[in-house]
From Swiss-Prot:
Family the UniProt entry places it in: Belongs to the bacterial ribosomal protein bL12 family.
Protein name (record): Large ribosomal subunit protein bL12
InterPro entries (UniProt xref): Ribosomal_bL12, Ribosomal_bL12_C, Ribosomal_bL12_C/ClpS-like, Ribosomal_bL12_oligo, Ribosomal_bL12_oligo_N_sf
Gene Ontology annotations for the cellular component aspect, listed alphabetically: cytosolic large ribosomal subunit
Endpoints of the signal sequence: none
Amino acid sequence: MAITKEDVLEFISNLSVLELSELVKEFEEKFGVSAAPVMVAGGAVAAGGAAAAEEKTEFNIVLVDSGDKKINVIKVVRALTGLGLKEAKDAVEGTPSVLKEGVSKDEAEAAKKELEEAGAKVELK
């Protein structure tokens, strides 16, 4: 039986952020491409400025620094992301790292507060 696009999309949607990042790197190496965003023409930037004035609804949680209490930060990262111990440790030690993408403002702020209480420095982008 052949694998369909839906099967591939279902598989990808079940990957963790760390696994997805590794998959993107493998695609870049295998096919010689880059996942970097394409430069936008000057006219489109002016139009995008109006959209940026609106309040942002989706945020990425970026761990900037794990601080002195790495074990506490790893525990919080595991609880927030569902990552295994090794993946969470790699994310904490490999800062800066994106822990979650496209989350609501409330979820992002709650995660930031929890991580900062554990001793980490976090940015919401």
